[in-house]
Amino acid sequence: MAFASASNGAVRFTEEQEALVLKSWAIMKDDSANIGHRFFLKIFEVAPSARHLFSFLRNSDVPLEKNPNLKKHAMAVFVMTCEAAAQLRKTGRVTVRDTTIKRLGSTHFKNGVSDTHFEVARFALLETIKDGIPASMWSPEMKNAWGEAYEHLVAAIKEGMKPVALL
Amino acid sequence: MAFASASNGAVRFTEEQEALVLKSWAIMKDDSANIGHRFFLKIFEVAPSARHLFSFLRNSDVPLEKNPNLKKHAMAVFVMTCEAAAQLRKTGRVTVRDTTIKRLGSTHFKNGVSDTHFEVARFALLETIKDGIPASMWSPEMKNAWGEAYEHLVAAIKEGMKPVALL
């Protein structure tokens, strides 16, 4: 599903931002399972209670670090986030697979995900990317490019979280 | 006001934990203004929307880094947090100046501070202390001691956030 920015115009994402995202994603891609896992462990380090938002963690005694469902979920979310960022400029839209953005919106709404949770995930994502690429590649511009791409994804998910107006 | 742990028993805080807190607080104390400021800037780095919880930030155009009210507030909160931690074992209670814990509870309740906000502040506090003491002094035990002291303070504030039952 394609999703335009809140203004309903095309997403603004410069060539330079796209180049930074593509360059760093190319480096991280092959290690998505581990980097995605670290992304989620960072979220839970900052906000331990966020684990209650995930059904497969609520009813599990397995430590977070060893939970296979978390590893699988974390990789899927990380890859989706990075691919949406990588395609942002080309498509001018947040692009994820069909129906996924609707499901994401509804799941996040149902589970009571708050603005602060989205912010914690943003912080965790940027910290994880910083540690996932060579130190010489990290810069304020790189941080900004990923931060903006993430904000576009969140705007799309939040749009999907809005209850449908009843006629 | 003195506040016991949730179990209404004395707070458990070991001699070792107290020693770690006292040792690191002694080093940070003289630089409380700067370290406290960094503590709050870290909170806003992780959760930018948390600035709306503070009346003196909501209506200000001054950048966070330069806001004198934030500097003042941050230092007061940091010193209170560290002093409560330093006195925890000796008193067996979270001890802050008279009426402060009630005011804290009521202010946090009124402004809609959530569990996630308290978690973000915990993460920011631990990161700030890590950077505020010599690297050789930081350890899992040090992190644990400050983390536990902070949890006791938060439990006291949350107790003060509960609406008074009506008879």
Swiss-Prot record, chains A, B:
- The UniProt record lists the keyword NAD: no
Instruction: Kindly list the residues the record flags as site (Homodimerization).
Output: 143
Which leading EC class covers this enzyme?
Answer: oxidoreductase
**Binding of heme b: at which residues?**
55, 73, 103, 107-108
One family from Pfam that matches here is: Globin
Q: Which domain of life is it from?
A: Eukaryota
Task: Kindly list the GO molecular function terms attached to this UniProt entry.
Answer: heme binding; metal ion binding; oxidoreductase activity; oxygen binding; oxygen carrier activity
The UniProt record describes its induction as:
Accumulates upon salt (NaCL), drought, cold and asbcisic acid (ABA) treatment. Induced in nutrient deficient conditions (e.g. Ca(2+) deprivation), but down-regulated in resupply conditions.
Globin domain: residues covered: 12-162
Q: Where is this motif: Homodimerization?
A: 45-49, 115-127
Q: Which UniProt keywords apply?
A: Cytoplasm, Heme, Iron, Metal-binding, Nucleus, Oxidoreductase, Oxygen transport, Transport
Listed under catalytic activity are: Fe(III)-heme b-[protein] + nitric oxide + H2O = Fe(II)-heme b-[protein] + nitrite + 2 H(+)
Cofactor binding note: Binds 1 heme group per subunit.
Q: Where in the cell is it found?
A: Cytoplasm; Nucleus
Q: What is this protein called?
A: Anaerobic nitrite reductase NSHB4
